[in-house]
Amino acid sequence: AVAAGKHVFLAKPVAVDVPGCRSVEESGRKATEKQRCFLVDFQTRTDPFYREAVKRAQYGDIGRIVCGEATYFCGPTWGDQAKWLAEKPGDPEMRLKAWGLDRALSGDVITEQNIHALDVAAWVLDAAPLHAVGSGGRKARTAGTCWDHFSVTFTYPQDVLVPFSSTQLGDGWDDICCRMYGTDGTLDSHYFGEVSIRGRLPYRGGKIPGRYQDG
C-alpha cells in the first residue's frame, strides 16, 4: 500500500514478532517521506480528554515524571473462539479463525489487547521502553495457547519505571488503566472511565459516552 502511494490504517496487533514490527516501522517511515498517512488505531489517541491530559503532562503540569503504572484487568475474552476450538480441536482452519486465542497468530494478550494500556505510557513519555523484565502464565484458561496473566516492568529513558500487570481470570476487578506520577501531580486515565490530572495544576477531565461508538 505504501509503495502504491496509499494512506494506511492499521488495527493492532500490527505485528507479532520483531521482524514484523521492524517491517511496519520501515513502512511507516516511507509513508511519512511520501507524505502519506500511516495510522494505527488506538481509540485513546482520538479521545479529547486523553489528548488534553497527555498534552498537559508533556508540558510539565505534573512536574518531572518519576514513574508510572499500567493495568489491564478483565474477564476471559474471545468466548466464541473458545467454542470453535472446542468443537474442532486440532483443526487448522479453526486455529486461524480463533486467532485471538493463539499466541503465534495474535502475539498473545499482552500484544493484542494489553497494548491499549501500555501505549498510553509510551504516549505520555513520548518514548519507547528501553527494556522490559517480567513473566506470566496460564493457570485458568483452557482454550488456545494464550496466557491469562502477565507481570512486566518496563524501563523508559531517564530510568522511568512503569510496572504493568494483566489478568483475564473470570469475574472480578475490571479496569484498563494507566497512571503517570510526577513531582507535582498524577495523570490518572481509565479506558472506560475518567481521565484527569490531580496535583498542583489539576485537570478535571472527563470521559466520552461510548468508547467504541465515539472513540
List the predicted regions and their residue ranges.
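Beta-strand-loop-alpha-helix segment that lines the small-molecule cofactor/substrate pocket
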Residues: 1-45, 60
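Residues that flank catalytic or metal-binding motifs in active/ligand-binding sites
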Residues: 4, 128, 148-150, 176, ...
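Predominantly a Rossmann-like dinucleotide-binding segment in NAD(P)-dependent oxidoreductases
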Residues: 33-39, 44-144, 154, 170-172, ...
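Glycine-centered tight beta-turn/hairpin loop motif at sheet-sheet or coil-to-beta transitions
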Residues: 157-161, 184
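Phosphate/diphosphate-binding loops
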Residues: 162-164, 168-170
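Short hydrophobic-aromatic micro-motifs
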Residues: 162-163, 187-189
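Surface loops and adjacent helix of pleckstrin homology
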Residues: 167, 191-192, 200
